[in-house]
Amino acid sequence: MAPVLPLVLPLQPRIRLAQGLWLLSWLLVLVGGLTLLCSGHLLVQLWHLGTFLAPSCPFSALPQVALAASAVALGTGLVGSGASRASLDAEQYPPWRGVLGPLLVAGTAGGGGLLVLALGLALALPGTLDTGLEEGLGSALVHYKDTEVPGRCQAKRLLDELQLRHHCCGRHGYKDWFGIQWVSNRYLDPNDPDVVDRIQSNVEGLYLIDGVPFSCCNPHSPRPCLQSQLSDPHAHPLFDPRQPNLNLWSQGCHEVLLGHLQGLASTLGNMLAVTFLLQTLVLLGLRYLQTALEGLGGVIDGEGEAQGYLFPAGLKDMLKTAWLQGAGPHRPAPGETPPEEKPPKECLPEA
């Protein structure tokens, strides 16, 4: 049974392999740590912006899986640096001989699987942000006025902070506020004819105005912020709703948050790809180094050439060996049964 992808390693290539693995492992530690920070940053951002994402949006799974994958990659890099450094010393390597094989299996199956899953999520999940933000921001705008409703008390504060921090207004623009009631009934006078007319002017019985909350105002504008009667061209002669202006934020929060979160997801996806490449190289190098040293009794500077490989035999041979070992002692087929020898006849005594 021939080994899979064998590689002959003389003395100097073995030493260079161990030294290169040590540098590559520390590079994996660095990249894994940066990926860990990127995952944590995206997770914190989603924790702050979770109110504006639909509960059914699965995007939050990306930083969680990426966090676990980067932590395993960081651990793989630390193991690789320790094992490659110890392989250069015949006295330090023996403790690694018994644990390096299981660690390689765990790193390949666990770490590789998590990285592949995280990369798949980084490619697939950003597309779900569009509908998730659309639904979440729409719900946030509707509940802006519910400052006294249990469970919705913080909706106004969170949306005001969002618009001020990200320089956005409404879901797709400031006109989104015209179609919802964002003033609480607590502050409306039911005896005011204007209030009654506005409530009776729509079938839903909402108090709709052509104004926006204060958080839509640009504090850096040189002019006073115009918040009411924005659709009346005669109310504010200097304000033209058809032209860009400095008073209100021009972008909607959907566009701003979508670009922000997709940018973070893209950065995280690139970091995961680099981490996957480095982890693959480290695991392959460790496997070749381990199998080469096993042929030399764990001594890297042993005499002669050593052969490193990925698997001691092909997949078919490995499965056949495992099957034979699990099936117990071999029982020959009926055609293979050797003929039984007849017992020798006993000689009768002569009379």
UniProtKB/Swiss-Prot annotation:
Record topological domains on the Lumenal side: 44-64, 126-264
Keyword hit for Transmembrane helix: yes
Subcellular location(s) of the protein: Photoreceptor inner segment membrane; Photoreceptor outer segment membrane
Gene3D superfamilies the record matches: Tetraspanin (1.10.1450.10)
Record keywords: Cell adhesion, Cell projection, Disulfide bond, Membrane, Sensory transduction, Transmembrane, Transmembrane helix, Vision
UniProt membrane topology term: Multi-pass membrane protein
Function in brief: Plays a role in rod outer segment (ROS) morphogenesis. May play a role with PRPH2 in the maintenance of the structure of ROS curved disks. Plays a role in the organization of the ROS and maintenance of ROS disk diameter. Involved in the maintenance of the retina outer nuclear layer.
Family according to the record: Belongs to the PRPH2/ROM1 family.
Illness the protein is tied to: May be involved in mammalian retinopathies.
Name this protein carries in UniProt: Rod outer segment membrane protein 1
